[in-house]
Amino acid sequence: MAMPENWVRFAIEISDAQWEEEEIREFINLFQYQGFDAAVVLSRIFELAKKADLSRDQMLRDIRALITLHLTRGNKLSSIEKRLSEEGKKEFALLKARYQLVDKAKEAADLTLSRIAIANAGLTCRILPQVVAHTAVTRSRMESLSADYPVCMMHNAFAGLIDETLPEDSIKALVDAHRLYLLEFSRTINVKHRGMEAKEILDANDSALQAGLASSFLTPSQKRAYLLSFKLVDGNGKVNKAVQQAATVLRSLI
């Protein structure tokens, strides 16, 4: 390849070069799959539900079933199947096939149980109070660390509901209270984390937390509405006592 003699002409030649639309679509897919786009996940769920000729109510039931499955059984499909009743296995097989579930996402539209839960953060956090006796980290465990710990914080989906327009001290309190759960969850599911310092564990998981906090899928007002419905903040954006207490416990550990 010869060196261009005129860089302006070279730039024009680049812009005039032809390409197939499929090439750009492949690039989008190639460079997007590591990220997470809730709209893509929801669109895929809707597409597959429509393909299965489901009603809206049936689709919503499926989403609730998938989130409950994730919250109580985790994300690894093979492990989940081994621990289900025969009736549960039949329902699981149906959902797995219908929504083409995978353990690990390789493309933007791939559906994992955790992606479905995070894309539906508001619903996930609404379901939590009903299932926290059956989760990896239970309500009683979190309350042993901080009395009246807010159960709606007990999944990493919660980070996507923190309104970035709240007063700075409220944001920090919500984040730190949520981090107390993330810390306990990491220690529970990852044996090697049990001997690590709290700050090391939190630092290792910080990128996922920051991605949730940076999510713009919901508007600040929509996020605030969820926080108000969970009674985590008041009309002035001030956090409640349980949140403040959990944040204080976390800070004492680091």
Swiss-Prot record:
Keyword match Nucleotide-binding: no
Pfam family, one: Tenui_N
A GO term, aspect molecular function: RNA binding
Binding site for RNA: 33, 36, 76, 114-115, 194
Major location category of this protein: virion
Keyword terms of this UniProt record: Capsid protein, Helical capsid protein, Host cytoplasm, Host Golgi apparatus, Host nucleus, Ribonucleoprotein, RNA-binding, Viral nucleoprotein, Virion
Cellular localization per UniProt: Virion; Host cytoplasm; Host nucleus; Host endoplasmic reticulum-Golgi intermediate compartment
A GO cellular component annotation in the UniProt record: viral nucleocapsid
Cited function: Encapsidates the genomic RNA, protecting it from nucleases. Displays high affinity for single-stranded nucleic acid. The encapsidated genomic RNA is termed the nucleocapsid (NC) or ribonucleoprotein. The ribonucleoprotein has a non-helical structure. Serves as template for viral transcription and replication. After replication, the nucleocapsid is recruited to the host Golgi apparatus by glycoprotein Gn for packaging into virus particles.
UniProt domain comment: The N-terminus is involved in homooligomerization.
Similarity comment text for this entry: Belongs to the phlebovirus nucleocapsid protein family.
Self-association and partners: Homodimer. Homohexamer; ring-shaped, necessary to form the nucleocapsid. Homopentamers; opened pentamers in solution. Binds to viral genomic RNA. Interacts with glycoprotein Gn; this interaction allows packaging of nucleocapsids into virions.
Record protein name field: Nucleoprotein
Protein encoded by which gene: N
